[in-house]
């Protein structure tokens, strides 16, 4: 799990034993759930785009979600949700 000093952490779409995580759109789903957590708080229409604090991406061809520390500073429960998602699904975190 991320250190307290980390400015971001990456949830990789690989389990700790190296299997690809399913469903294939998991990163977009997680980022979609987190879309309301953003600078200035939730606002009308912001569910149509990802939060800058929780963004789906690719790292070395592997789907991932990049989670910024600013999310923790704004809402520790949302941060914990992302950490617990990775832990509950046995996903690699960088």
Residue ranges of predicted features:
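Glycine-rich loops and low-complexity Gly/Arg-rich segments
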Residues: 34-38, 90-93
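Short, intrinsically disordered low-complexity segments
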Residues: 28, 35-73
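Generic preference for flexible, low-structure residues
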Residues: 2, 25-27, 42, 46, ...
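N-terminal, charge-rich interaction modules
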Residues: 1-33
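Intrinsically disordered, low-complexity boundary segments flanking structured domains
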Residues: 1, 52-54, 79-80
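Short, compact, well-ordered microdomains
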Residues: 60-94
């Amino acid at each position: 799990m991320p250190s307290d000093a980390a400015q971001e952490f990456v949830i990789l779409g690989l389990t700790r034993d190296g299997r690809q995580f399913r469903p294939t759109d998991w990163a977009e789903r997680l980022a979609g759930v987190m879309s309301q957590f953003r600078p200035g708080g939730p606002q009308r229409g912001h569910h149509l785009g990802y939060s800058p604090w929780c963004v789906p991406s690719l790292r070395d061809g592997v789907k991932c979600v990049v989670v910024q520390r600013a999310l923790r500073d704004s809402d520790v429960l949302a941060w914990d949700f992302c950490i617990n998602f990775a832990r509950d699904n046995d996903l690699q975190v960088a």
